[in-house]
């Protein structure tokens, strides 16, 4: 029962669209009318530069970190917690962000929240592996497909977790998280791309699209 409660709480924590809220509060803009309509940190950057992106990133990271600590708390309270229950609790905030009910289940790609969760459950090596891989690709191969970049980031993260000899439950949490991220990448590059194309602008266009569906 307690495990189910933590899974539900973590899903709700992840579903809070902080980047969208930051855009509305600090600049009065809907960041989902920019770029690929993703309600995440990258479109906050497109909509208002670092003034929006920095607080959005901090808050999105923080919700993942808090959820990750709650998942770890399950083990502290009951070391016999089933591996699958812990893994679901760790992946729940990522799913919450990707399928948030506050935005009609059209959430973001969950990169920042994933970073927060894995920093909480695996420490700074995991954070540096994931964030470092994404940043390095942006610097060296910025035009690479997003799906490739995030997939490589997750592969490096999983490799570091394996090198750290983390318990098997981490592999399950990693697989669940990776599955959510891949689904979101597929949606934004195929399903949601159809919406973008109707307004005559590419998925990487920074201009707001009049008539597009906001959050």
Indicate residue ranges for each PLM-predicted region.
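Helix-coil boundary and interhelical linker segments in multi-pass alpha-helical membrane proteins
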Residues: 1-6, 66-88, 119-126, 161-173
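N-terminal signal-anchor transmembrane alpha helix
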Residues: 2-27
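Cytosolic, membrane-interface loops and tails of multi-pass inner-membrane proteins
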Residues: 20-53, 107, 189-215
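Short, non-helical or kinked segments that cap or interrupt transmembrane helices
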Residues: 29-40, 101-115, 143-153
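Interfacial segments of multi-pass membrane proteins
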Residues: 45-48, 71-74, 92, 111-143, ...
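Multi-pass membrane catalytic core of lipid/isoprenoid biosynthesis enzymes
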Residues: 46-72
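Loop-to-transmembrane alpha-helix initiation sites
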Residues: 126-131, 145-153, 165-178
């Amino acid at each position: 029962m307690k495990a189910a409660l933590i899974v539900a709480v973590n899903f709700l924590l992840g579903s809070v669209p902080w980047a969208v809220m930051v855009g509305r509060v600090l600049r009065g803009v809907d960041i989902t009318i920019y770029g690929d309509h993703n309600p995440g940190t990258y479109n906050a950057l497109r909509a208002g530069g670092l003034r929006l992106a920095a607080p959005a990133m901090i808050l999105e990271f923080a919700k993942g970190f808090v959820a990750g600590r709650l998942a770890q708390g399950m083990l502290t309270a009951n070391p016999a917690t089933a591996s699958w229950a812990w893994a679901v609790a760790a992946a729940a905030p990522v799913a919450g962000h990707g399928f948030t009910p506050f935005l009609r289940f059209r959430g973001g790609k969950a990169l920042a929240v994933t970073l927060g969760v894995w920093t909480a459950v695996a420490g700074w090596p995991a954070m540096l592996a994931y964030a470092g891989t994404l940043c390095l690709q942006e610097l060296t191969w910025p035009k690479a497909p997003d799906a490739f970049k995030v997939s490589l980031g997750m592969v490096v993260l999983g490799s570091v977790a394996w090198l750290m000899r983390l318990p098997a439950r981490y592999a399950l949490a990693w697989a669940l998280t990776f599955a959510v991220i891949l689904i979101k990448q597929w949606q934004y590059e195929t399903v949601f791309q159809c919406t973008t194309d109707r307004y005559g602008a590419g998925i990487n266009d920074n201009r707001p699209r009049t008539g597009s569906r906001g959050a």
